[in-house]
């Protein structure tokens, strides 16, 4: 960016660069350019599909059958959707497994008959609390006043003055 070109910062006087000797008319034009609304960038979905390079022109797709030919695309979408939901189910299952077992610390892997690995789930102790557990009063929650001890010999004078 050219530091001599006026910008909103140089016009307002907050620029670290020295002001140039632009005319007032040039500054007004520059201000008007900055005040005009910006043009919205085109979105990907608004753009036309890209054209293939001239060297790699592919043959035109085969004509669609009488039914519209959407059956194959719908089947492919259905398969993708089914795989997606299967993946979601696996993620939920793993999350529940981690929640129940308390990470990988709680599981032991041992080999059993047939060479198959089986997980013995050794549950971690996870205490459950209910509001009744906290219903009792804590000793630290009250202001404790020291008890006054009653002397065993109440009239004993310990002063040494005579």
UniProtKB/Swiss-Prot annotation:
Alphabetic keyword roster: Nucleus, Plant defense
Segments crossing the lipid bilayer: none
Residue ranges, compositional bias (Basic and acidic residues): 69-80
Pfam families: NPR1_interact (PF15699)
Subcellular localization, as worded in the UniProt entry: Nucleus
Region annotated Disordered, chain positions: 1-80
InterPro entries xrefs: NPR1/NH1-interacting
A GO biological-process term: regulation of systemic acquired resistance
Predominant place of localization: nucleus
GO cellular component: nucleus
Function text: Binds to and represses NPR1/NH1-mediated transcriptional activation of LG2 in vitro.
Family: Belongs to the NPR1-interactor family.
Record-given protein name: NRR repressor homolog 3
Organism: Oryza sativa subsp. japonica (Rice)
Encoding gene (name): RH3
